[in-house]
Amino acid sequence: MLLVNLAIFIAFLLLLAQLYRKTEKLGQTVFIGLLLGLLFGAVLQSAFEKPLLDKTLDWINVVSNGYVRLLQMIVMPLVFVSILSAIARINQTRSLGKVSVGVLSTLLITTAISAAIGIAMVHLFDVSAAGLIVGDRELAAQGKVLDKAGQVSNLTVPAMLVSFIPKNPFADLTGANPTSIISVVIFSALLGVAALSLGKEDQALGERIAQGVETLNKLVMRLVRFVIRLTPYGVFALMIKMAATSKWADIVNLGNFIVASYAAIALMFVVHGILLFFVKVNPVDYYKKVLPTLSFAFTSRSSAATIPLNIETQTAKLGNNNVIANFAATFGATIGQNGCGGIYPAMLAVMVAPMVGIDPFSFSYILTLIFVVAISSFGIAGVGGGATFAAIVVLSTLGLPLELIGLLISIEPIIDMGRTALNVNGAMVAGTITDRLLNK
């Protein structure tokens, strides 16, 4: 049966390839791949025992994990070359300050809004930490959470800011540190400023540098486009894995929390659309253009791996400035994450508060929580780890117990898909808003 399963998988891949060749519509093919993957994965889980299912997924993961690794491969070269190239072409370095402020302020404001929405959804759906099942998996997860809490306890804002400054740019280009992406952004920006300075002193030298950087940029972008064409197949394989490994009993047991989480995520997508409308961007057209990128973010559960798609979508489809697109995509992958850094920790903080005698819906607690969530979403870039670290930072800051994080481990992948898509959309929205405001 293994060979039959793989034959069907390959047949679906060929079908997607034929469809893409005929239509040349990447977004449409990605969406079809997502639906086919969901269907095929559900059939695999219901029809086969775990040993055969695991063997089938091992081969399917060659496509899914291979695609994710290809995207991870091009993240650092893309960020480095794109920002260096874009800055080398601009005339005023002070524009960098405006771009940084615009992107970061939009990310933090939308994170605060997402926290408020998360709080409201807990109240609306009456979600509580009481009665959650504690099994062996949950106990093991709680132990890991407490271990990670030790990494957060010594993290201060000054230490976090210092960690952004590149110490060894070559090590950062390998992604060796949690802050490597931001460090590469800073290094490439400084190198771009140095190129501008040389160009002012020696115009001929400046032109040669600009031509060399532009050639390198075109080479990297051609590689990016090669990888992006593989998106339908990567999304298809990733969706199979998700559907085939989801535990439906856990989904039923924690259904209320899942529904509340996705209601908050959906509402935040609406808020993003409203914000875009205010800067004269049609939300419907916007979401049509970004759907392939959101589909990949949803299935891969990786904001960092989505950076190449994010930048390509912003520049090629949304018309955003290259510098703004790079800053928004890279900062948005680590700072001001609307889903992992906003909605999720806010919901947990409200659910846990009654256990220690705090009224989670008092005005003072809500204001404090939103402020802590917004600031903490900036700080988690210093440690990495997404939603888990964000929740640890927020709960620790408020003096709340951390055990709830481990109790939700069984549904973490299901919720994380929606959170990651929202993170990526928040980054693209920040880039689009900043671009429209600075280029009026």
Curated annotation (Swiss-Prot):
- One Pfam family from the UniProt entry? SDF
> Which residues span the membrane?
1-21, 29-49, 70-90, 101-121, 179-199, 226-246, 258-278, 343-363, 366-386, 389-409
GO CC annotations on file: plasma membrane
Cell location = Cell membrane
This protein's membrane topology, according to the annotation, is:
Multi-pass membrane protein
**GO MF term list:** L-cystine transmembrane transporter activity; symporter activity
Q: Which UniProt keywords apply?
A: Cell membrane, Membrane, Transmembrane, Transmembrane helix, Transport
Q: Which PANTHER family match?
A: L-CYSTINE TRANSPORTER TCYP (PTHR42865:SF5), PROTON/GLUTAMATE-ASPARTATE SYMPORTER (PTHR42865)
Q: What is this protein called?
A: Uncharacterized symporter HI_1154
Species of provenance? Haemophilus influenzae (strain ATCC 51907 / DSM 11121 / KW20 / Rd)
